[in-house]
UniProtKB/Swiss-Prot annotation:
The keyword Cytoplasm appears for this protein: yes
UniProt protein name: Eukaryotic translation initiation factor 3 subunit K
Assembly information from the UniProt record: Component of the eukaryotic translation initiation factor 3 (eIF-3) complex.
Subcellular location: Cytoplasm
Length: 250
């Protein structure tokens, strides 16, 4: 069972106090939340509830919006996929930033804004991760210098995403071709892959066959289980059905 979205073990006491009271709607707390986003980027934590509170303040006070803070929040949300965090954050942004503008005016505004371009590029990355197109995610991330600029403030971004991908792979597979896994994790060579899967994931590398295979230990997600359901239907149940049929006919 996942952790509730309003919970965060690393949340400072002053942030907890703001979120628990009416000050969460006070525009003066915007700078406090912004500093907290910077802290999250530096110490590799993520507080979705606090970040949503900041985006809600931006929604009510558009003049306070800081594009860099918003993009940092979105980048941090990428590091906790698969989760609704990115979609929730995206939904609180101005309509003209959305990947699919609903009007010509919004489309025109989107074309003229670097901020909108950044948001939509990050939305593209989120879509690739959520749809498990991991190789395409890395190639897209490496295809444009703007992506490098967007993730620069988030310490360990690639490592955090790589670990999340490994977690998802471990849920779905018992063994994976090493060359395929290299592409999914964006590691440069077989030595780097072997180090990652053995030291970080505690998986095994099998080189005995014609192709190197990475073996994932059995867990409750990837274990093949046959599900057998048995239902007992008594004669009295049939009797009620037949009797009801005659009653309706009458």
């Amino acid at each position: 069972m996942g952790v509730a979205i309003d919970k965060c073990e690393t949340r400072p006491a002053n942030i907890e106090a703001i979120l628990s009271g009416l000050d969460r709607y006070n525009p003066e707390t915007t700078t406090v939340f912004q500093d907290y986003v910077v802290q999250q980027c530096e110490d590799r934590t993520f507080d979705c509830y606090a970040n949503l509170a900041l985006l809600k303040l931006y929604q009510f006070n558009p003049h306070l919006l800081q594009p860099e803070t918003v993009t940092n929040i979105l980048v941090k949300a990428l590091t906790v996929f698969p989760s609704p965090a990115f979609s929730l954050c995206l939904a609180l942004l101005p309509a003209y930033t959305q990947p699919f503008p609903s009007s010509e005016a919004e489309a025109t505004a989107a074309q003229m804004s670097d901020f909108v371009e950044s948001v939509q590029k990050l939305a593209r990355l989120s879509s690739l991760l959520e749809s498990a197109q991991y190789a395409q995610f890395w190639s897209t991330l490496n295809s444009d210098d703007l992506y490098a600029d967007l993730v620069a403030d988030v310490a360990g971004f690639e490592e955090l995403v790589r670990i999340r991908i490994a977690v998802e792979v471990g849920k779905a597979f018992r063994e994976v071709n090493a060359e395929v896994l290299e592409q999914w994790l964006d590691v440069r060579n077989s030595e780097a892959l072997e180090k990652f899967v053995t030291e970080v994931c505690s998986w095994e590398v099998d080189k005995s066959g014609s192709a190197t295979v990475v073996k994932v230990p059995t867990n409750k997600e990837n274990e093949a289980r046959s599900e057998v359901k048995s239902e007992r239907v008594g004669v009295d149940m049939f009797g009620r059905v037949i009797r009801r049929g005659f009653e309706q006919a009458a």
